[in-house]
């Protein structure tokens, strides 16, 4: 049997098996673990009472986090004319139309979010095989296809959690970074959970928010008391 590393031993010592944590306790534990060699994100997983095999129970959305994510987000925008100028003023890193599409087809994908004005979708649609697998395809359901490209840029830059329920009925999102204090994480988590509740499918029955888990990139997953997150 392989020996545990110092980090693994520290994690084992800090985590109580089968414990359900308050949000503050979970943040404290994750922040107290030995640091990795890079800035770890704090991630949330929420088990939902949905059946993702049914098209009307696929929960998908984007939540602007009040305390941000701590990450620098590069944004590309497909727009022209006044909308292109507005996107630039809002802080977009790359703005273009046909020229941006050609750049992407050439392999330039140095951005984290793609936003498109509605009239640009005829151009963006041709990039589905490139953007789709990378989770970059603009979609009106998450606010990345919109006439208000400037507003979408500001939201993306300020820090957004984008999510789509997986086959197991779970959504995953970055909610901050290791080092964020508990108050900031609580702001972000409560905002996300409130948005998830607004997205509850009408056909979903029984308990909707079934389980919440908080983890760091290289750390353990800690179960958080659902009732400790405000309704």
From Swiss-Prot:
Question: What are the alphabetically sorted keywords of the record?
Answer: Repressor, Ribonucleoprotein, Ribosomal protein, RNA-binding, rRNA-binding, Translation regulation, tRNA-binding
CDD domains reported in the protein's UniProt record: Ribosomal_L1
Any one GO molecular function term: tRNA binding
Which GO annotations describe the biological process of this protein? regulation of translation; translation
One Pfam family name is Ribosomal_L1
What is any one of the record's Gene Ontology cellular component terms?
Answer: cytosolic large ribosomal subunit
Q: Does the keyword Glycoprotein apply?
A: no
State its role. Binds directly to 23S rRNA. The L1 stalk is quite mobile in the ribosome, and is involved in E site tRNA release.
Q: Which family does it belong to?
A: Belongs to the universal ribosomal protein uL1 family.
| Assembly behavior | Part of the 50S ribosomal subunit.
Q: What is this protein called?
A: Large ribosomal subunit protein uL1
Species of origin:
Acinetobacter baumannii (strain ATCC 17978 / DSM 105126 / CIP 53.77 / LMG 1025 / NCDC KC755 / 5377)
Lineage here is: Bacteria, Pseudomonadati, Pseudomonadota, Gammaproteobacteria, Moraxellales
Q: Per UniProt, what is the name of the gene that codes for the protein in this document?
A: rplA
């Amino acid at each position: 049997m392989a020996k545990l590393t110092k980090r693994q031993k520290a994690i084992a010592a800090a985590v109580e098996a089968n414990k359900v944590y308050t949000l503050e306790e979970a943040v404290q534990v994750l922040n107290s673990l030995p640091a990795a060699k890079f800035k770890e994100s704090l991630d949330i997983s929420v088990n939902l009472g949905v059946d993702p095999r049914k098209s009307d129970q696929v929960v998908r959305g984007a939540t602007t986090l009040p305390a941000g994510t701590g990450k620098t987000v590069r944004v590309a925008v497909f727009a022209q004319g006044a909308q292109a100028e507005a996107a630039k003023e809002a802080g977009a890193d790359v703005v273009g139309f046909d020229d941006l599409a050609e750049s992407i087809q050439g392999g330039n994908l140095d951005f984290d979010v793609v936003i498109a004005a509605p009239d640009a979708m005829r151009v963006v649609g041709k990039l589905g095989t490139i953007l789709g697998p990378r989770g970059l395809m603009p979609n009106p359901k998450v606010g990345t296809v919109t006439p208000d490209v400037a507003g979408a840029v500001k939201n993306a830059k300020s820090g957004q959690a984008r999510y789509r329920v997986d086959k197991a009925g779970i959504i995953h999102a970055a909610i901050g970074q290791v080092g964020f204090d508990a108050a900031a994480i609580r702001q972000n988590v409560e905002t996300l959970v409130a948005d998830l509740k607004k997205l509850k499918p009408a056909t979903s029955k029984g308990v909707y928010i079934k389980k919440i888990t908080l983890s760091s990139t290289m750390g353990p997953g800690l179960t958080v008391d659902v009732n400790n997150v405000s309704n």
